[in-house]
Design a protein with these regions (language model features):
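N-terminal first-folded block
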Residues: 2-46
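Short glycine-/acidic-enriched loop or helix-start segments at secondary-structure transitions
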Residues: 14-15, 33, 57-59, 79, ...
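Hydrophobic/aromatic beta-strand patches that form the interior of the parallel beta-sheet core
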Residues: 22, 48, 68-70, 101-102
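Residues at secondary-structure transition points
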Residues: 30-35, 52, 75, 79
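Acidic, metal-binding active-site segment of PIN/NYN-like and related structure-specific nucleases
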Residues: 44-58
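Mid-chain, well-packed structural core segment of small domains
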Residues: 55-89
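Charged phosphate-binding loop/patch that engages nucleotide di/tri-phosphates or the phosphate backbone
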Residues: 90-112
C-alpha cells in the first residue's frame, strides 16, 4: 500500500520515512486537489490529508481513491508524532478493508 501525503501533513515524521510514502511537496506544492485525486486513482494510492474537501468530493463521486482524513485538530508536533506511533497500525488495518476513514484523536471512524 502506497500513501500520498498531502501538503497539510508534516512529512518529516519517522513513521513516514520509507518507500510507502510519497509526499505532495516533493511532486508540486501547488498541486491542485483534483490532480492529487487523479494521481491517487491512477496509481491506487491512499490519500493522507486533513482537508475535508476530499470527503466532500468522495460523497459526490462514484469512484474515488482510498482516503484517510485526520481530524485531530491543532496538535503540537510531538503530540502528532505520538498519535501516529500509537495509531498507525490500526489505521492501516482499517483502510485495507474500507475506502474512507476519519482518524480522530481518540477514535477511528469508518465512513465508506
Amino acid at each position: 500500500m502506497t500513501f500520498l501525503v498531502d501538503v497539510n501533513l508534516p512529512g518529516f515524521f519517522s513513521k513516514f520515512q520509507h518507500g510507502d510514502f510519497i509526499f505532495v511537496f516533493n511532486i508540486d506544492q501547488q498541486l491542485a486537489d483534483s490532480e492529487l485525486w487523479k494521481l491517487a486513482l491512477m496509481n491506487d494510492y491512499v490519500i493522507l490529508t486533513r482537508d475535508m474537501d476530499f470527503y466532500n468530493r468522495a460523497k459526490e463521486s462514484i469512484t474515488f481513491p482510498k482516503i484517510i482524513i485526520f481530524r485531530f485538530g491543532n496538535l503540537k508536533l510531538n503530540a502528532m508524532q505520538k498519535y501516529f506511533q500509537e495509531n498507525w497500525n490500526s489505521i492501516v488495518d482499517i483502510i485495507k478493508e474500507n475506502k474512507l476513514i476519519f482518524a480522530w484523536q481518540h477514535e477511528l471512524e469508518i465512513i465508506y
